[in-house]
Amino acid sequence: MRKLSRCEDGYVKIQGIYIYYKVCKAENEKAKLMTLHGGPGMSHDYLLSLTDLAEKGITVLFYDQFGCGRSEEPEKEKFTIDYGVEEAEAVKKNIFGDDKVFLMGSSYGGALALAYAVKYQAHLKGLIISGGLSSVPLTVKEMQRLIDELPEKYRNAIRKYGEVGDYQNPEYQEAVNYFYHQHLLRSEDWPPEVLKSLEYAEERNVYRTMNGPNEFTITGTIRDWDITDKIGIISVPTLITVGEFDEVTQNVAEVIHSKIDNSQLIVFKACSHLTMWEDRDEYNRILLQFIEKNI
């Protein structure tokens, strides 16, 4: 059992709604790290493996984005990445003031982090994109390639029931589960923090509205989102991480790496999307090394 750093949590009013946050403070703080969870529609819980960094001098901020986890939900028309960027900026100002921070985004949070950096990179010391994306269409195309590589039984079930929208069919659900254990988290026993985030995604409206029924069927409002042509202006030090078997594939990570000059790309062998759990110690070591280098 790992020791959880001293963390404080609460709510801040952001853009008219209450947003839940948790700050794990380092005793001898070297830097501040703000995290953006994925989904869209998950919660911060699955990122709590990063609390290890607080023992190494990094104060870590987590929060549940609008309509996610323990946070309130705005009107549906505000379910956009642009709204999420302004929310992130307001949370950062509320908790950390004008201090420059490192920003880490996981999965969809990586897309949000890129969009934030395009507008607010002057507020950052560095950027960390973990299994993130700059283009939803490219990501969907890559996920379809992964589906094509599944065993025939699962591939056919996804095609057959996906085409008619029968997402609750037991055969379809079995195939989704197989895909997730190959490309989302390659572990038999999933940590309770991950299960909690998935539970919130199922309960709340954001995931279905912005994303769709599952990880590889993106039919929601973000389906056409692509910021690839804008991220070239990002000049802050950028760390891009991706798992060897990541559902947001290495090809997606390579595109981001090619567009951001001051970036490095690290591929975690034998890992998939949630590398922060599959190779927790090494993942946190890499992040700490990057942060300490760019303080």
Swiss-Prot record:
Keywords: Aminopeptidase, Hydrolase, Protease. Part of the tricorn proteolytic complex. Cleaves H-Pro-AMC as well as a wide spectrum of amino acid substrates and several peptide substrates without a proline at the N-terminus. In conjunction with the three factors F1, F2 and F3, Tricorn degrades oligopeptides in a sequential manner, yielding free amino acids. GO terms for molecular function: aminopeptidase activity. It comes from Thermoplasma volcanium (strain ATCC 51530 / DSM 4299 / JCM 9571 / NBRC 15438 / GSS1). PANTHER family: AB HYDROLASE SUPERFAMILY PROTEIN YCLE, MONOACYLGLYCEROL LIPASE. Its EC number is 3.4.11.5. The active site is at S107 (nucleophile), D246, H273 (proton donor). It is an enzyme of class 3 (hydrolase). The keyword Hydrolase applies. It catalyses: Release of N-terminal proline from a peptide. Belongs to the peptidase S33 family. This is Proline iminopeptidase.
